[in-house]
């Protein structure tokens, strides 16, 4: 009898991707985050679908429809907070996943890496538009400030902003289109994930040593399915602790005030996962310069393969590069902290220094350290 798992047109794709997939025998728990991101995406799509059943994308009723979900819908509060904190879990896993790629040199798989960068931009756009939907004060003013950045683009900026707004200010048309995009983008993300995996399975996974693992592979199931399951349980524990004990910990109290175009909140700031980029944006006094720095702070990931000077792929045996990597990590924590602080001395200076350090480390210091390590190893 032929094995249906290996011969059925649909099942053999699943089989070759998640069951009989040859995987390196030494990949650590840092490789868990890909599957956790898949779980986060599934959670966001499911909870989002249930929220969309009760939400109305209209400026007059959006805020009260979210209130209605929390108060009147059966377990609506759980669905709403799972969705809100699920986004935080998503970005936490994303940042660790990217950090793992940088540390172990996974960016040398260029197609997978580039699709990953497109995925990052798409997820950020989706999260930004989702934050606008409850139509609280921070939703409205966040949308106004961030979309207004496009007006810095020469010649077409103002027209572009009004085109996105669907009028002369953030209003009903803006909310409706943001809801439409927020609904469709996760499915586009799911399609991009398939492309990401397609390219990954063309080359095979990297491993902590950064060497070829062709001579030593093990099947993905049961070894890595059970390992991923442990990661999933731990992530679920963290997510449910947040949702059930402190659901508003990562949110902004201002978003519990309905949007009012006539009253500006004292400090306009995005969710925690955008704060590092927001700090870089604010550290440059010029509007266009700030926007370019903001975009380049993420787009810089695309040129990292070109900046890789070391002869070794991974940082496992490169202690100097490890120091630089952890300094970069600490710098990102500082930028995240600064992004949530008011614009005043000495915080402005700290933000500017941290922004300079961020770009210097990636563009100058780390490539130089790679060359120094080559020299030390007489390579």
UniProtKB/Swiss-Prot annotation:
Can you supply a Gene Ontology BP term from the record? Answer: mitochondrial electron transport, ubiquinol to cytochrome c
* Annotated InterPro entries: Cyt_b/b6_C, Cyt_b/b6_C_sf, Cyt_b/b6_N, Cytb/b6-like_sf, Cytochrome_b, Cytochrome_b_C_euk/bac, Cytochrome_b_N_euk/bac, Di-haem_cyt_TM
Instruction: List positions binding heme b b566.
Output: 97, 196
Q: Which residues bind heme b b562?
A: 83, 182
Which cofactors are named for this entry?
A: heme b
Q: Where in the cell is it found?
A: Mitochondrion inner membrane
What keywords were assigned to this record? Electron transport, Heme, Iron, Membrane, Metal-binding, Mitochondrion, Mitochondrion inner membrane, Respiratory chain, Transmembrane, Transmembrane helix, Transport, Ubiquinone
Family classification: Belongs to the cytochrome b family.
Q: How does it assemble?
A: The cytochrome bc1 complex contains 11 subunits: 3 respiratory subunits (MT-CYB, CYC1 and UQCRFS1), 2 core proteins (UQCRC1 and UQCRC2) and 6 low-molecular weight proteins (UQCRH/QCR6, UQCRB/QCR7, UQCRQ/QCR8, UQCR10/QCR9, UQCR11/QCR10 and a cleavage product of UQCRFS1). This cytochrome bc1 complex then forms a dimer.
Recorded protein name is Cytochrome b
Please give the organism: Hapalemur aureus
**Classification lineage:** Eukaryota, Metazoa, Chordata, Craniata, Vertebrata
């Amino acid at each position: 009898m032929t094995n249906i798992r290996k011969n059925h047109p649909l099942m053999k794709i699943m089989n070759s991707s998640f069951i009989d997939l040859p995987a390196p025998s030494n990949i650590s728990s840092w490789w868990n985050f890909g599957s956790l991101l898949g779980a986060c995406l599934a959670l966001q799509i499911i909870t989002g679908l249930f929220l969309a059943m009760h939400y109305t994308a209209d400026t007059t009723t959006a805020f009260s429809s979210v209130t209605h979900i929390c108060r009147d819908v059966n377990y609506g509060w759980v669905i709403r907070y799972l969705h809100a904190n699920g986004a935080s879990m998503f970005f936490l896993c994303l940042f660790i996943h990217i950090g793992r790629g940088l540390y172990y040199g996974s960016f040398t798989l260029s197609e997978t890496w580039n699709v990953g960068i497109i995925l990052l931009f798409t997820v950020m756009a989706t999260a930004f538009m989702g934050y606008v939907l409850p139509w609280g004060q921070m939703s409205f003013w966040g949308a106004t400030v961030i979309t207004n950045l496009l007006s810095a683009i020469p010649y077409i900026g103002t027209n572009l902003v009004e085109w996105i707004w669907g009028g002369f200010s953030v209003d009903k048309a803006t909310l409706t289109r943001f809801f439409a995009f927020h609904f469709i983008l996760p499915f586009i993300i799911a399609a991009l994930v398939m492309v990401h995996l397609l390219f990954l399975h063309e080359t095979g996974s990297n491993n902590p040593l950064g060497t070829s693992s062709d001579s030593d592979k093990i099947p993905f199931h049961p070894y890595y399915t059970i390992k991923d399951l442990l990661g999933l349980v731990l992530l679920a524990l963290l997510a449910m602790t947040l949702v059930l004990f402190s659901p508003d910990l990562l949110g902004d109290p201002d978003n519990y005030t309905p949007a009012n175009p006539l009253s500006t909140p004292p400090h306009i700031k995005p969710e925690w996962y955008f704060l590092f980029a927001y700090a870089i944006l604010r550290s440059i006094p010029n509007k266009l310069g700030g926007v370019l720095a903001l975009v380049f702070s993420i787009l810089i990931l695309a040129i990292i393969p070109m900046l890789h000077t070391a002869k070794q792929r991974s940082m496992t045996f490169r202690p100097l590069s490890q120091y630089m990597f952890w300094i970069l990590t600490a710098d990102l924590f500082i930028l995240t902290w600064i992004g949530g602080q008011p614009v005043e001395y000495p915080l402005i200076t700290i933000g500017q220094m941290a922004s300079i350090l961020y770009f210097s480390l990636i563009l100058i210091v780390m490539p130089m350290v790679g060359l120094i390590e080559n020299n030390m190893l007489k390579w």
